[in-house]
Amino acid sequence: MNKTLIKLLSVFLIVNNLLWLDKTPAIVPYFYIPNNKNLEKESLEIGKGAYQLLYFGQNKESLKLAKLAISINAKNEKLWAILAESQVANNLFDEALLSIKKAKEINPSMSELYFAEGSIYLKQKNIKEAKISLLKGLEIKPKNTNALFQLGNIFLIEKKYNNALKQYEKAINIEPRFWQAINNKGLVYFELNKIVKAINAFEKAIAIEENAEPILALAVSINSNKNEESIILAKKALQKNPKYVSSQYRKEQLW
């Protein structure tokens, strides 16, 4: 085979390989880039996970997840509300109020945000701001029994007893088995020295829920006339909730 033929064969093989390579698909690495819709969905799932962790008492983990959800989607008021709840669970009340503020900027007509804000202010003993928030929320959603109850408690603290009764009665009319509101009606009657009405309210609350609070309240109410029965009831209440031994705890329960 002469040199010319060998050169031609070599050129043919090179060209053929080049043509084959040109037909081979390139291997390009694939990166998943989520769109806005997918990001929103992921953030809501993370937020849901953060909310569920609160029920298991995993407050720090809940806070981390809630912050992650917000870092992905800061335009959802529900995620800000979840973050606020996680912050409250970690005693970060000022930060929680800022989160509620962010949520209200996104959706100022969401009543739950004002109710949550009111609850946070109550934890901070800021009665004035708590009342403003609760009243604003009730303008939007007037039949929220928990908000009515909390507003009644504020009036009770302020010794505006008739106003307190009105709020408790509104809540009870909506939710007849709302024993906490019935119990606090009894507290109002007790403060007004209407002992018979107070006893009736406490007994009604106990019939719905044998909680330590109305049992102890009943014990105090009947103490002057039925001392032995009062002692029995007081012991029963303290067995159910020993925290009532603490004067600070009783004060927190509006005693």
Question: For the regions a protein language model found, what residue spans apply to each?
Answer:
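Helix-start (N-cap) detector for alpha-helical repeat units in TPR-like alpha-solenoids
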Residues: 42-43, 77-78, 111-112, 145-146, ...
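Residue-level recognition of tetratricopeptide repeat
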Residues: 51, 85, 119, 153, ...
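Structural marker of alpha-solenoid helical repeat scaffolds
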Residues: 72, 106, 140, 174, ...
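TPR/TPR-like (Sel1-like) alpha-helical repeat modules
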Residues: 203-246
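N-terminal leader/linker segments that initiate helical-solenoid repeat arrays
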Residues: 2-73, 78
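Structural signature of tandem alpha-helical TPR/SEL1-like repeats
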Residues: 55-64, 89-102, 123-136, 157-170, ...
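Canonical tetratricopeptide repeat
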Residues: 82, 116, 150, 184, ...
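Terminal, low-structured helical/coil segments at or just beyond the last alpha-helical repeat
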Residues: 27-39, 231-255
